[in-house]
């Protein structure tokens, strides 16, 4: 069974409930991964539970944002954003209110319904639904760019790590991998008729290669069914195992993504102790080293307390390491147990960082409050870029 990841970076918590509730954030996958999903159904969540454990899950579920938090309201129009007078930086003991620029529209559309129905029929899950991403209507519906995309999470719903921004459930030894998952995932993607697919996963430190072979098999199965579909892999760091990175980089993928998540100075505060900035840089550098034509991509969450100088320095290190594509989005607190949002960054500030990224030479920079590592508009741009490159390579070979 293919599951889904949180666009904020690692992976999302699996849910058997199929209600659409837009996410508070982050890919992940990426895109990022900041939203608690639960295995409780809508009907059971309203009935009293005799178990303290179930009560706790209900409490945590209610701590997060719901559909109404994200649906466009009276201040959602851009012309009215300046009227917002709520605090954007957190004071001690305070929990910030969601600003109007994080509002979105209810997802609709023919292609949206097609993907949703196929998921039900094949009993598959995507990061888009399970992370309750607010961009789901744009991505699934084709939207302005007429390029349908989805993000699939491989290797289960349980992570071996515990990052402080991510609500995915954790265990030292998650259930074993499903050997049929690569084939079944490729079958589902072929049925959807997608142009661009993102594969991501939880961390699986319990597996010798971290699941790299499983990733590679999935890419191969997808490409065998449709060589034209573009595949992005948003991978873990494999604890620095570059052989695992190489296996995926050479699997036939088009984009190799790995998220550094935050600035260098906040790594230990935000990520699991087994992850670090230099290890993530080595993953991105090695992917480019073994396959120079592959596009490398990473994502950063803003609003965790980073400074402008730290962001600038982080972007410089990423560019110096040969990273091609960059996304920056707003961090969202999934539950009260997770890191608080220190600041809601304004759209103007996100636009500033997008300009900085472009000037630094990133091939593509997407920066905005609702931008995630797996983001529709970015995939449209990358699709056109990759197709242009392939055409040029074919022409050069023919000559």
UniProtKB/Swiss-Prot annotation:
EC supergroup of this enzyme? transferase
Question: Which SMART domains does the UniProt entry name for this protein?
Answer: Elp3
Q: How is the cofactor bound?
A: Binds 2 [4Fe-4S] clusters per subunit. One cluster is coordinated with 3 cysteines and an exchangeable S-adenosyl-L-methionine.
Q: Which residues bind [4Fe-4S] cluster 2?
A: 159, 163, 166
Q: Which GO terms fall under biological process for this protein?
A: lipoate biosynthetic process
**Keyword tags:** 4Fe-4S, Iron, Iron-sulfur, Metal-binding, Mitochondrion, S-adenosyl-L-methionine, Transferase, Transit peptide
User: Cellular component per GO?
Assistant: mitochondrion
Regions that span the bilayer: none
Protein name, per record: Lipoyl synthase, mitochondrial
Q: Which organism is it from?
A: Danio rerio
